[in-house]
Amino acid sequence: MNQVAATVVDTDVFSLMYLRRANSDSRAAGWRQYLTGRRVLISFQTRAEVLAGARSAQWGNRRMAEAIEILDRTPTIRPDNEVVDAYAELVAECRRLGHGLQARDHTGDRWVAACAIAKRIDLLAGDAIYQGAPNLVVRG
């Protein structure tokens, strides 16, 4: 039996590929090609960021319902013990290495990375902060 390769997508990729109505970002074509035939997953952090962004932007009922439907159809990695352990290890290693992901304003990014690390799945992200992060396979 062939297993479908999976990819965790960061919030920027998820938003651009699945939620934006006008898509003129030059990275979209490459991301679409990479994701073709792959199982797309998101982190609980991405779900939270999408919902917070939509509520802050005061999306209308229809657009909010569409976003929730898309989120509900997308497998979401929850913060189980593996994810929490991966997060703790990532924090310690980033501090030891002086990697930028250690910064306070990257807490959400660390959770996304920890989800990918814990489940041994690559991460597709448009944010360069992930490059060189320990134990993380990044595509972008």
Where are the regions a protein language model picked out?
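A generic structural signal for short hydrophobic patches within well-formed alpha-helices
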Residues: 14, 47-50, 84, 130
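Short, well-structured N-terminal submotif of metal-dependent ribonuclease cores
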Residues: 1-43, 52-69
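Active-site neighborhoods of divalent-metal-dependent phosphate/nucleic-acid chemistry enzymes
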Residues: 2-3, 75-122
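Acidic active-site catalytic centers that drive phospho-/nucleotidyl reactions
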Residues: 10-12, 109, 127
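Generic structural signal for small/hydrophobic residues in well-ordered secondary structure
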Residues: 10-11, 50, 87, 116
